[in-house]
């Protein structure tokens, strides 16, 4: 059987960049990783509670963290930042206070910025959230996958593969269903492929959604 490598790690330094940009002493490296995870979890929880914007999709494509001696810079790439923009900087300040409460930043200043991304449905995380919302509302998985493919085609991608695994439609035996449209060259390193793995809780149990999007070839 073929061994599946993570498409993002496979392309690091070629077509993909790191989402955390900092250096640390080897002994303190694990602390830095845990700190990053706390920041990401805190932001996602806050967005889930306060910023339900568009059909149950939070719209976070990725969160980049850059650290210096005196500053932690967090950039949130969002597809639908309407609520944040409408409320001005008040929501961002509230989010900064929430994140600072969660972890000890010490003498470092925390700065959070929000960047809007074009073609949000060209990003696998946002697309996975859309499919998860559909599955929670008991929409047929085939219908949800086809709708997701339509949305990515409008975003101008070259290919997409969607896979859903688990107790699909409440069937007793778990299975894997997938659909592909266009080209998805997973073995070509110069092909820019975005990927995400997203768990969704349904009344029948947890389903796993995996999405590969072929953006462009460099």
Curated annotation (Swiss-Prot):
Q: What Pfam families does the annotation carry?
A: Ribosomal_S3_C (PF00189)
Note the SUPFAM superfamilies from the entry.
Prokaryotic type KH domain (KH-domain type II), Ribosomal protein S3 C-terminal domain
Top-level taxon: Eukaryota
Against InterPro entries, the record matches this protein to: KH_dom-like_a/b (IPR015946), KH_dom_type_2 (IPR004044), KH_sf_prok-type (IPR009019), Ribosomal_S3_C_sf (IPR036419), Ribosomal_uS3_bac-typ (IPR005704), Ribosomal_uS3_C (IPR001351), Ribosomal_uS3_CS (IPR018280)
KW Chloroplast (keyword) present? yes
Q: Which GO terms describe its biological process?
A: translation
Keywords, A to Z, come to: Chloroplast, Plastid, Ribonucleoprotein, Ribosomal protein, RNA-binding, rRNA-binding
Location in the cell reads:
Plastid, Chloroplast
Q: Which residues form the KH type-2 domain?
A: 47-118
Gene Ontology molecular function: any one: structural constituent of ribosome
Question: Could you state one GO cellular component term attached to this entry?
Answer: chloroplast
Cross-referenced PROSITE patterns, in alphabetical order? KH_TYPE_2, RIBOSOMAL_S3
Q: Does the keyword RNA-binding apply?
A: yes
Please describe the quaternary structure of this protein: Part of the 30S ribosomal subunit.
Q: Give the family per the record.
A: Belongs to the universal ribosomal protein uS3 family.
Q: Which PANTHER family match?
A: 30S/40S RIBOSOMAL PROTEIN S3 (PTHR11760), SMALL RIBOSOMAL SUBUNIT PROTEIN US3C (PTHR11760:SF19)
State the protein's name. Small ribosomal subunit protein uS3c
**Organism (species):** Cucumis sativus
């Amino acid at each position: 059987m073929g061994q599946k490598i993570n498409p993002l790690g496979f392309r690091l330094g070629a077509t993909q960049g790191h989402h955390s940009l900092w250096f640390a002493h080897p002994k303190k490296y694990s602390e830095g990783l845990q700190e990053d995870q706390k920041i990401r979890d805190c932001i996602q929880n806050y967005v889930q509670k306060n910023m339900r914007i568009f059909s149950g999709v939070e719209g976070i494509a990725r969160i980049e963290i850059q650290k210096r001696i005196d500053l932690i810079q967090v950039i949130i790439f969002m597809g639908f930042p309407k609520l944040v923009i409408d409320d001005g900087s008040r929501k961002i300040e509230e989010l900064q206070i929430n994140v600072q409460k969660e972890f000890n930043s010490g003498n470092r200043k925390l700065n959070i910025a929000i960047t809007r991304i074009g073609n949000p449905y060209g990003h696998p995380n946002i697309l996975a959230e859309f499919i998860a919302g559909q599955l929670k509302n008991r929409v047929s998985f085939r219908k949800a996958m086809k709708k997701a493919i339509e949305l990515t085609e409008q975003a101008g991608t070259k290919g997409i593969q969607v896979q859903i695994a688990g107790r699909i439609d409440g069937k007793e035996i778990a299975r894997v269903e997938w659909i592909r449209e266009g080209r998805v060259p997973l073995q070509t390193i110069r092909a820019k492929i975005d990927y995400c793995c997203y768990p969704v809780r349904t009344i029948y149990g947890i389903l796993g959604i995996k999405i590969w999007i072929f953006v462009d070839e460099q």
